[in-house]
Structures are given as C-alpha cells and as structure tokens.
C-alpha cells in the first residue's frame, strides 16, 4: 500500500438541518451524547492507521477548528503527519470560498505533494458510520483502479437523494448520475472515494480549467471520467452501518437508534473506538426520585426527573417532575421542573424554564419552512431561553439565541415558530 493521505470535506452548511446549523458547520453538529459528526470520520482514519489528514473547512469553521485543534484526542498531534485544518486559499486571483468539492481538493494539491501522497482518500465529514478504509484501499489496489467509490444499496424510492451508479459484473462503474429524478439503479455513492494521486491530480487540473464545470466530484468530475473514458473507476460495496443525517428527521432517528436494545451502530466496540474532544466532567448523576429507561446519559448530566428513549448529552440538567421522551438534548442545556418534552431536539446551552410543555397537541405544517421542518419534531436552536409556563406544539421552531421577551404568547401552536428579534 502506498502512502495514504485523507482529505475530509468539512465545509458543508447543512441547510436541511435548519436552526441546528445556523451557527455551526454540519460536521460540527453534536451527535450521540458526546460526539460531533466529524469525529466518526476522524476516528475511522486513525483506526485504519491513516495519520496524514487534511480537514477542508469553509462555512462557519470556528467551532470545528477549535474542536479538532492539534488532533490530540485522535492521536493526530504528530511531528510526522497529523491533522491540518485547510481553509480556502485567499489570494489575489482566488475567491474566499471553495467553489465545489473538487475545487476544494484542487486548491490543496500542494498539501498532498508535501505529504508525498500516493493514494488519496476523499471523505465527507458529516456522516455517521464505522469503516475500515483499508478494506476499500485493498479492493482498489486489487482491481488496479484509478479511482474507487464506496457504495451501498438503498431503497429505490430514496435513490434520487444520492449519486447513483451502474456497474458491470466486475464491479467497474459504467455510468454515474448525481441525484437523478428517475434512478436506473439503487447503488448509491457514500461520498467516500480513493484515488491514485497522479490520476486525481490530472483530472482535477482538467476540471479546474473547464469553464462549464461546477467543480464537484459527483456532478462533474466522476461523470466526465466515465463519459470521456479517462480512467477506470470501481464500486466498493459497503455492508456496514452508514447514515446521512442531513435532515432533521434522519438526525433524530439516527440518534434514537443508539438506544435500541441491539443498536445497529455500536459505540461500545473496544476494537473500533470513537474519539472526541470533550470537556472533562464528573460522572452522570441520577437522583433517587428520577426514572430512566432506554436512554444514553452522558457524563456531567444530572437527572432529577424522568427520561425515556432519549439521548442526553454532557452537562444536561433535568429538573424534578420533568418528563423527557423520544428526544435529543444537547450539551449544557438546563430543563426546569415539571416540564414535559416529547419528540424534541434541543441544541446546546439552552435554558428551559419551569412548567414548560413541548411537542404537545396535533401535528401541523411548518409556517417557517415545511421543506426543512417536515412534521412531528420540535427544534430549539442553541443559546435560547424559554420562559416559565410556555406551551409549544409539535413541529415548532425556536430560533438561535431566542430570549424570553421574543415570546409574544405563552402558547405556540403546532407548526409555529419564534425567532430572535433583530437588534
């Protein structure tokens, strides 16, 4: 195996996650009680023995850069190799932003040269999965491919959300369509690629000089390689757990899968650990009057109420008489006494008063954005404060940084929203 360098695409805005990504990039979104989404890709790298990693940031990079730091939690603080944050290059003839996924890697060819790359892994930093990249690389080398794309079969009705490929009997890709309205196959790209470096360099330079390209791997680079027969691309079929948590519903579902009696995604595998940078906190405390079942409760949490089928992050406090069901409550959120929360996602550093009810009543279409907020789930943005005695229905949205005075009424009907007043 040649020298492998991983390039993690971590600049995504994640607009379909609504208020959850208003202030942070999608790869920085908290997940699973203590992690951020990028932790899974970084952990897969080090568990696969890949210690040369570039993280390509763009949209709101501050939280992500602070989280990764010098890479110590992932054993990536190394003199030889390690992790490097790669923001867009700003020069006299360059824009401040990467123009697409392919352009992002193109702008960092120098980083690949400096690290003597022979094979380049191009990875998304916002999916939840466990993969030994050596299996992908071994398959790539066995086939003598120029590039190999990890893929899996998805339900045909969902296929139009993915890059879809058609292969021959040998596994060679003969056609690729990015998010086709009428898919001819259900073999979906996972956004995980390995390329021979010299081949990748050549096609990226060609793509950069193409005025008609949007400089995206799925939309432009991969289809052109196939269309013009520029190289051999193979499909590596992955049969493990992989989730695209790019919508509010899929994010909520993937979190709650973790509390199933036999979860499809194992956070506890001693042979494939997931690492993160998190604050040191004392053990979780469950009070004598508290009741908990089928939940993840992270360190530093204090539970004085009832928690069922939920994911409770670090430093969360749940007051006496409060009931939390089917919900995701993120770091350092405080919930007062005698509250009721069901089917709710609450972001970081939220303060919820006493006697607050959330996720109650009949479901209704979102008045804010029905394409993003598709029903059932009520979402609260980070750094918000919800005053005492407020009743909030289903499919409601509380924006980022909302203050008590932003609530014009004590009862928010299902589908309604509260946003912070513009200063």
Swiss-Prot record:
Cysteine-cysteine disulfides: none
What Gene3D superfamilies is this protein classified in? Hexapeptide repeat proteins, Spore Coat Polysaccharide Biosynthesis Protein SpsA, Chain A
Keyword line: ATP-binding, Carbohydrate metabolism, Glycogen biosynthesis, Glycogen metabolism, Nucleotide-binding, Nucleotidyltransferase, Transferase
Question: Where does the secretion signal sit in this chain?
Answer: none
CDD domains the record matches: ADP_Glucose_PP (cd02508), LbH_G1P_AT_C (cd04651)
Q: Which InterPro entries does the UniProt entry name for this protein?
A: ADP-Glc_PPase, ADP_Glu_pyroP_CS, GlgC_bac, GlmU/GlgC-like_hexapep, NTP_transferase_dom, Nucleotide-diphossugar_trans, Trimer_LpxA-like_sf
**Keyword Nucleotidyltransferase appears in the UniProt entry:** yes
Is this entry keyworded Cell membrane? Answer: no
Which reaction is catalysed here?
alpha-D-glucose 1-phosphate + ATP + H(+) = ADP-alpha-D-glucose + diphosphate
EC number(s) per entry? 2.7.7.27
Its annotated pathway? Glycan biosynthesis; glycogen biosynthesis
Q: Name one GO biological process term.
A: glycogen biosynthetic process
Return one GO MF term: ATP binding
**Top-level enzyme category:** transferase
What's the subunit arrangement here?
Homotetramer.
UniProt function note: Involved in the biosynthesis of ADP-glucose, a building block required for the elongation reactions to produce glycogen. Catalyzes the reaction between ATP and alpha-D-glucose 1-phosphate (G1P) to produce pyrophosphate and ADP-Glc.
The text of the family note is: Belongs to the bacterial/plant glucose-1-phosphate adenylyltransferase family.
Alphabetized HAMAP family for the sequence:
GlgC (MF_00624)
Stated name of the protein: Glucose-1-phosphate adenylyltransferase
Record organism: Thermotoga neapolitana (strain ATCC 49049 / DSM 4359 / NBRC 107923 / NS-E)
């Amino acid at each position: 195996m040649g020298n492998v360098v991983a390039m993690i695409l971590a600049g995504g805005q994640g607009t379909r996650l609504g208020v959850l990504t208003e202030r942070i990039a999608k790869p920085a979104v908290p997940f699973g009680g203590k992690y951020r989404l990028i932790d899974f890709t970084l952990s897969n790298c080090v568990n696969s023995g890949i210690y040369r990693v570039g993280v390509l940031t763009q949209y709101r990079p501050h939280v992500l850069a602070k989280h990764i730091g010098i890479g110590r939690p992932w054993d990536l603080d190394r003199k030889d190799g390690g992790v490097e944050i790669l923001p867009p290059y700003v020069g006299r003839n360059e824009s401040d932003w990467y123009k697409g996924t392919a352009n992002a890697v193109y702008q960092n060819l120098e980083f690949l040269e400096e690290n003597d790359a022979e094979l380049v892994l191009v990875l998304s930093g916002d999916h939840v999965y466990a993969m030994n990249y050596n299996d992908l690389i071994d398959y790539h080398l066995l086939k003598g491919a120029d590039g190999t794309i990890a893929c899996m079969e998805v339900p045909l009705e969902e296929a139009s959300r993915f890059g879809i490929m058609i292969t021959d009997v040998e596994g060679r890709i003969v056609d690729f369509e990015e998010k086709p309205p009428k898919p001819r196959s259900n073999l979906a790209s996972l956004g995980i690629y390995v390329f021979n470096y010299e081949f990748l360099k050549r096609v990226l330079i060609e793509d950069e000089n193409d005025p008609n390209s949007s400089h995206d791997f799925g939309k432009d680079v991969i289809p052109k390689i196939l269309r013009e027969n520029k190289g051999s691309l193979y499909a590596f079929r992955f049969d493990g757990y992989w989730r695209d948590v790019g919508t509010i519903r899929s994010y909520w579902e993937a979190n709650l899968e973790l509390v199933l009696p036999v979860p499809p995604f194992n956070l506890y595998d001693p042979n494939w650990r997931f690492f993160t940078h998190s604050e040191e906190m004392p053990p979780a405390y469950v009070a004598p009057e508290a009741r908990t079942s089928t939940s993840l409760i992270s360190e530093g949490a204090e539970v004085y109420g009832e928690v069922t089928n939920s994911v409770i992050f670090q430093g969360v406090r749940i007051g006496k008489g409060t009931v939390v069901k089917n919900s995701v409550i993120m770091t350092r959120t405080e919930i007062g006494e005698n509250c009721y929360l069901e089917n709710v996602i609450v972001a970081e550093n939220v303060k919820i008063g006493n006697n607050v009810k959330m996720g109650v009543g009949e479901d209704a279409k979102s008045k804010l954005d029905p394409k993003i907020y598709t029903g059932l789930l009520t979402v609260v943005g980070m750094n918000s404060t919800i005053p005492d005695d407020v009743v909030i229905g289903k499919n409601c949205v509380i924006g980022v940084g909302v203050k008590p005075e932003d609530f014009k009424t004590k009862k928010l009907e299902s589908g309604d929203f509260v946003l912070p007043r513009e200063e």
